[in-house]
Amino acid sequence: WFLGVKPLAKFSSNNEIISPTLSTYEISYRNIIQNNLKHYLDIWNLIDQTWHLKPLKYEYMNFWKSNQEQEMFLQKGNALQNEKLSNFLRMLNVSIPHQSFDKINSYALFLIDKKRKLLEVGLNI
């Protein structure tokens, strides 16, 4: 889910809408993740044509993951639910600044809506 994400030289949570706001622990965790992303840079450089599926709104990820877990429960009888699902979604929403996903160096960008319908396609040649 973070293919191509690079550490940000400088990031601020002030321009993100996250509710509830980031805790001190979450801010500290974000810094750890930013440092850990440095270890992926060599891997990202080996991939020469990333295709980036990007939601129009970041929060669509919550909707998609919740639906995925509901389907898994219906099909397999087991899935993340209630507090476990909420905690997982919170981790996804706060671990990497949203602006990081705007800076992925991709060959192709596919912008999709909440229903995963294609809105726009672009090439970064």
Language-model-derived ranges and their functions:
Residues 2-125:
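Conserved NTP phosphate-binding and transfer environment spanning the P-loop NTPase/kinase superfamily
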